[in-house]
From Swiss-Prot:
This is Large ribosomal subunit protein eL30. The keyword Coiled coil does not apply. Keywords: Ribonucleoprotein, Ribosomal protein. Gene3D superfamilies: 3.30.1330.30. It comes from Methanococcus vannielii (strain ATCC 35089 / DSM 1224 / JCM 13029 / OCM 148 / SB). InterPro entries: Ribosomal_eL30 (IPR000231), Ribosomal_eL30-like (IPR039109), Ribosomal_eL30-like_sf (IPR029064), Ribosomal_eL30_CS (IPR022991), Ribosomal_eL8/eL30/eS12/Gad45 (IPR004038). One of its GO terms (biological process) is translation.
Length: 105
């Protein structure tokens, strides 16, 4: 059950990257959150503690939901179809994805 749930999240992330508007990277995610943009932040499980604290601080101020995915940044990059690690991503528009429902499950 846990594996299937993880696969659904991975698929939703990939669809959001392919069909929606997603910002990759911690610096760009924090920058957009500070401007009140974004609907959901997804953080890799191995994201640096200080970066994670910054993201949680700014998302609390902007009331943006955060989901900590239990994959590494390298795996999150692969899920996004990128050849580099992704520690955080910010969903601006979900596209055809049901990514915004993951916090409710």
């Amino acid at each position: 059950m846990r594996r299937r749930y993880s696969m659904d999240i991975n698929r939703a992330i990939r669809v959001a990257v392919d069909t929606g508007n997603v910002v990759l990277g911690t610096k760009q995610a924090i920058k957009n959150i500070k401007h009140g943009e974004g609907k959901l932040v997804i953080i890799a499980g191995n994201c640096a503690k200080d970066v994670k604290e910054d993201i949680f601080y700014y998302t609390k101020l902007s009331e943006t939901p955060v989901y900590t995915h239990q994959v590494t940044s390298i795996e999150l990059g692969a899920i996004c179809g990128k050849p580099f690690p992704v520690s955080a991503l910010l969903v601006l528009e979900p596209g055809n994805s049901a990514i915004l429902n993951i916090n409710n499950e």
